[in-house]
Amino acid sequence: MPQLRDSGNHSTAPLDAHTKDEIQSFARIFGIETEYGVSVTGSDRPCDAGQTAMMMFQPIVAEARSTNTYIENGSRLYLDVGSHPEYATAEARDPMDALALDAAGELVMRDLALDAQRRLRSIQGAGSTVHVFKNNVDSAGHSFGCHENYLVRRFVPLKTIEQELLPFLITRQLFTGAGRMGEQGFQITQRADFLDEAVSSATTRSRPMVNTRDEPHADPDAFRRLHVIIGDSNRSQWATMMKLATTHLVLCVIEQAGREGKDSGFARFSFADASAANHKVSRDLTGVEASFDMADGTVMEGGAVAIQERYLEIVERFVGQHPEVCSSLPRTDVHEVIRRWRRVIEAFRSGVSETFADKVDWLAKRRLFDMLRNRAGGRLSVSKLEQLDMDYHDVANGALYASLCRRGAMRTLVNESQAHEAIDVPPHDTRAALRGRFIQSARSHNAQYSCDWTRLSLTSPNRMDVTLLDPFDAQPSDRFLTILEALQ
């Protein structure tokens, strides 16, 4: 949930009863920001990625007079620094809603790319093909990101996040890694070689795993927005849902420990060197062979699986003691999340991780690459495998991922019809519903307007605005209704 402008992140009033209830609950707001890579092949002359991205956004500029806008589902669509189109999902209370919005973003990018491709072919030849990659590393070795956002209670110290959440984020890549083929061979994650700090407020001069820049887009006295940078861009919908849901459950444990002034049980898993641990996890395809130097001076054997087992154990016990956690996610079964989490860990522990190749991106790729190598008698080059790797992530013209889905070799949780619906329909139970309603009304009446995550503004004929500081609140205020009436 990136910020367009300062929109009132500093509260001036005491917490109201509704906000106090939210602080005491386990409810959460989720969001996913995805930067896409762009390239063109088959054209009569070289085509710069930045120019192609601008061509993709020409319809956006024609309508919004900017490369930075919000669409009717409440999500943000914009052209990031350089040549990276970016899509940030609207606020969601549930991982399944965030997943649907993320899938909608893939379709939005595909449509923009294919429209640009049609125009490009009339200029640079019929073979011109626009590729839009939902991955994290381009062919030149440049890295770009997929960032998860979680609304976290303000009373949780940042140091606690670093010590207790980061080991989970690093080791969960067993089932959330997107996989990467390179000259050094195949590894689980795309981002491990590019992240050089554990926690930082910077995003340009360093690449932290968790960003601490304080932009809550909510009441800053009550919440902070946890900006997770370590994750890969997933094509697997199962992996996207699981990374959000399991991280939520770990955060619930951490928050409750903060409320009660107790030990969560996670502190003992803190790494001596998070970056070194991240590299080890990414290169241990078994999930059980790596060993880690811990912050307390000990060495932990058993790889990422051993740490994930401990986190699961604590979460499972916690949910049993706090059944209200189950109602924190409106559309996701917490017990089913725990069952899936246990099964994938057990698969690695038992040496049968390939049974999750229909759910985990890096396992799907490895199975595919191994099969193609065998067909070619082991003579498939690294460059050919890298090409196939890129095709897997191409949401515009890629064939591999779509083929896996059609054949049932990759599990989906949101079908294309549901993803198309999510392009126009925001979640009904967050402030995204109000933003989407405002945008739809303003566009239908050709009104001039602007908005960001916490403010909606009607700019012509009369300037009117409303602040939406509570991301959980989907109920229209009198001020909001007055603005809608002004649009009639």
Swiss-Prot record:
Q: Which reaction does it catalyse?
A: ATP + [prokaryotic ubiquitin-like protein]-L-glutamate + [protein]-L-lysine = ADP + phosphate + N(6)-([prokaryotic ubiquitin-like protein]-gamma-L-glutamyl)-[protein]-L-lysine
In this chain, Mg(2+) is annotated as bound at: 33, 78, 86
EC id:
6.3.1.19
Which leading EC class covers this enzyme? ligase
Q: Which UniProt keywords apply?
A: ATP-binding, Ligase, Magnesium, Metal-binding, Nucleotide-binding, Ubl conjugation pathway
List other remarks: The reaction mechanism probably proceeds via the activation of Pup by phosphorylation of its C-terminal glutamate, which is then subject to nucleophilic attack by the substrate lysine, resulting in an isopeptide bond and the release of phosphate as a good leaving group.
Protein name in the entry: Pup--protein ligase
PANTHER family from the UniProt entry: PUP DEAMIDASE/DEPUPYLASE (PTHR42307), PUP--PROTEIN LIGASE (PTHR42307:SF3)
Q: Could you give a single Gene Ontology term from the biological process aspect?
A: modification-dependent protein catabolic process
What is the recorded function of this protein according to its Swiss-Prot or TrEMBL entry? Answer: Catalyzes the covalent attachment of the prokaryotic ubiquitin-like protein modifier Pup to the proteasomal substrate proteins, thereby targeting them for proteasomal degradation. This tagging system is termed pupylation. The ligation reaction involves the side-chain carboxylate of the C-terminal glutamate of Pup and the side-chain amino group of a substrate lysine.
Sequence similarity: Belongs to the Pup ligase/Pup deamidase family. Pup-conjugating enzyme subfamily.
